[in-house]
């Protein structure tokens, strides 16, 4: 009898790449002419990035710089969750950007429902912040991966432990 094949669906961010991208973005902000005499900065705190700038326009530029550095380091922008722009001390504005790690229960249920509705002969189960998909046929597993890549679930998905 053939052994069941499986893979895990996860949503993780490589933190070292985020750290590198934040440092590169901060360096670019310090060197750019349009940010001279500006209070613009980025700071990484645990699972969030704090953006500070003089006004909304410069804050938008800081976000653009950060996003370009993250993309260059292959960090998906779907892993970012932007908070509200808030006024801060000294006539500045600040914004928190959360790094979304793991698949929430709601997204896990949505993924399960998509897999079950597709009628592909596999089973899926939520295990903490990941979803495990098991099936007898590896082609069915490939089909599930293709199905999920086509869907826009609003989070970055990685497929790991393919066995």
Swiss-Prot record:
Cross-referenced HAMAP family: YajQ
Lineage: Bacteria, Bacillati, Bacillota, Clostridia, Eubacteriales
Organism whose genome encodes this protein: Desulfitobacterium hafniense (strain Y51)
NCBIfam families: PRK05412.1
SUPFAM superfamilies: YajQ-like (SSF89963)
GO cellular component annotations of the record: cytosol
Pfam families membership: DUF520 (PF04461)
Similarity remark: Belongs to the YajQ family.
Entry keywords, A to Z: Nucleotide-binding
Function summary: Nucleotide-binding protein.
MF (Gene Ontology): nucleotide binding
Protein name (database record): Nucleotide-binding protein DSY1969
Superkingdom field: Bacteria
InterPro entries: DUF520 (IPR007551), UPF0234-like_C (IPR035571), UPF0234_N (IPR035570), YajQ-like_sf (IPR036183)
């Amino acid at each position: 009898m053939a052994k069941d094949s499986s893979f895990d669906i996860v949503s993780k961010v490589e933190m070292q790449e985020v750290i590198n991208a934040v440092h590169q973005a901060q360096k670019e902000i310090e060197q750019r002419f349009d940010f001279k005499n500006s209070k613009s900065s980025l700071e990484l705190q645990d699972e969030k990035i704090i953006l500070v700038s003089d006004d909304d326009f410069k804050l938008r530029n800081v976000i653009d710089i950060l996003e370009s550095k993250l993309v260059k380091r292959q960090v998906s922008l779907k892993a970012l969750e932007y908070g509200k722009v808030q006024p801060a001390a000294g006539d500045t504005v600040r914004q928190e950007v959360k790094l979304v790690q793991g698949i929430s229960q709601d997204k896990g249920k949505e993924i399960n429902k998509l897999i079950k509705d597709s009628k592909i002969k596999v089973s899926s189960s939520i295990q903490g912040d990941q979803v495990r998909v098991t099936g007898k046929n590896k082609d069915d597993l490939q089909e599930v991966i293709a199905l999920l890549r086509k869907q826009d679930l609003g989070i970055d998905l990685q497929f790991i432990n393919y066995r």
